[in-house]
Amino acid sequence: MNVPVLDIHEIVAGNMVALVTRRAARDLFDAHRIIAMPNLDWAKIKAATLMIGASAKSFDWRTASSEAIGCEVGDITGKLTMCLHDRYFDAFGGPAAWIEKVTAECREKLAPLFQLTAGERAFLDGVLERGEIDASPMGAPESVRAAIEACPALRWKVQNVKAWKSGDKSPATRTRRRRRHDP
């Protein structure tokens, strides 16, 4: 059986985009655990973060910043605490202190993801301004560039950017993949 599986770096990148665009406690919790994981290739994570961030529906990834990392105490008490043991936040001095500590650590460790090179900015400008996918300025290996350029979400994004720029304000229709029929 051939089952496609996402690379761990793509999964981490998806969490990094969610961390900034949703500002949810669960994403901050995950990010804090991720920054402690050994053997991650942060260059791959950055490339995948740019790909996923550029694909975001209503967020301009060029404006992403480590300062956007964080969450509200109410999100922890309303959603995250039910997934953790009762006294999880006590060791940190409570949920507010946990947010302060973890936010500072994540902002420091993840800051390089938001420091764009000229090539990375050119990639984002191409996607978001002209509806073009050209990953070559990013300086990533050919296999990574090919994966970025083939990304379905990014292709849908550029289709919408082109339509929007031409005056068509309706979103492009998403096409569904045909179901596979197993023998």
Please give the residue ranges for each predicted region.
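Structured mid-to-C-terminal alpha-helical surface segments
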Residues: 1-183
